[in-house]
Swiss-Prot record:
It catalyses: Cleavage of peptide bonds with very broad specificity. Component of the 20S core complex of the 26S proteasome. The 26S proteasome is composed of a core protease (CP), known as the 20S proteasome, capped at one or both ends by the 19S regulatory particle (RP/PA700). The 20S proteasome core is composed of 28 subunits that are arranged in four stacked rings, resulting in a barrel-shaped structure. The two end rings are each formed by seven alpha subunits, and the two central rings are each formed by seven beta subunits. The catalytic chamber with the active sites is on the inside of the barrel. It holds the Pfam family Proteasome. The lineage of its organism: Eukaryota, Viridiplantae, Streptophyta, Embryophyta, Tracheophyta. This is Proteasome subunit beta type-7-A. The active site is at 40 (nucleophile). One of its GO terms (molecular function) is threonine-type endopeptidase activity. Belongs to the peptidase T1B family. The keyword rRNA processing does not apply. The gene is PBB1. GO terms for biological process: proteolysis involved in protein catabolic process. Its EC number is 3.4.25.1. Residues 1-37 form a propeptide. Its main location: cytoplasm. One of its GO terms (cellular component) is nucleus.
């Protein structure tokens, strides 16, 4: 009696095969990769005429300060900029990708980019990777509908607020905003408040540090204030580098001439055997 086999189509849904594999490898002694701790303070607020973004300039590699003066405010469009926190490679790659898409859209339509367009592209990309792209963003810009400020989390969720903070120093920066922010801020008041919030993150968070970068976006204009404030300047007295106290200098070469010439003469006769 012949028995016919029927191919049963696989059931849909998430496959946990790799999870079982990871558990087996862990039981056999394989150490799973640990969570990567990153640090940054990025902020943004809406003022009377537009949007102001701010960021610190420290890039870390674990416990090491890899770069003291990096740029965390990324260009998206002439009227839109984006601050990035998280893994530097992810934030730069995501913002560059969306920036190129916005440029193609401007070429095709002949119109300025809208902030909501950049927001949609960013959140769709991050949501599709379920948080594995480590990019936490503060997006700000001014378009035909006015100023806009959004926060985008690595999993794809977003917020729309008059002021926002992200990164490991976000709590310290948010405390400054909640205490001093008010509607209708002038340009100078907004810049001062953003700089103060970034400094709060720099001095209260080990992952944030160095200088303060600020970007002011208004209708038809933008101003990027690179190294607007340096809360931790180098304190070297000499332009050549470190200065040492007297009698503790490091000498690479030292030539000391003798005070007088010494002549050695032989006295007596050699001993006989």
């Amino acid at each position: 009696m012949s028995q016919s086999t029927v191919d049963v189509p696989p059931k849909g849904g998430f496959s946990f095969d790799l999870c079982k594999r990871n558990d087996m490898l862990t039981q056999k002694g394989l150490k799973a990769p640990s969570f990567l701790k990153t640090g940054t303070t990025i902020v943004g607020l809406i003022f009377k005429d537009g949007v102001i973004l701010g960021a610190d300039t420290r890039a870390t590699e674990g416990p090491i300060v890899a770069d003291k003066n990096c740029e965390k405010i990324h260009y998206m469009a002439p009227n839109i900029y984006c601050c990035g926190a998280g893994t530097a490679a992810d934030t730069e790659a995501v913002t560059d990708m969306v920036s190129s898409q916005l440029r193609l859209h401007r070429y095709q339509t002949g119109r300025d980019s809208r902030v909501i367009t950049a927001l949609t592209l960013l959140k769709k990309h991050l949501f599709s990777y379920q948080g594995h792209v480590s990019a936490a963003l503060v997006l700000g810009g001014v378009d035909i509908t006015g100023p806009h400020l959004h926060t985008i989390y690595p999993h794809g969720s977003t917020d729309t607020l008059p002021f926002a903070t992200m990164g490991s120093g976000s709590l310290a920066a948010m405390s400054v905003f909640e205490a001093k922010y008010k509607e209708g801020l002038t340009r100078d008041e907004g810049i001062k408040l953003v700089a103060e919030s970034i400094c709060s993150g720099i001095f209260n968070d080990l992952g944030s540090g160095s200088n303060v970068d600020i970007c002011v976006i208004t209708k038809g204009n933008k101003e990027y204030l690179r190294n607007y404030m340096e809360p931790n300047p180098r304190t070297y007295v000499s332009s050549k580098g470190y200065s040492f106290t007297k009698k503790t200098e490091v000498l690479l070469t030292k030539i000391t001439p003798l005070l007088e010439r010494v002549e050695i003469t032989e006295v007596g006769e050699a001993m006989e055997e």
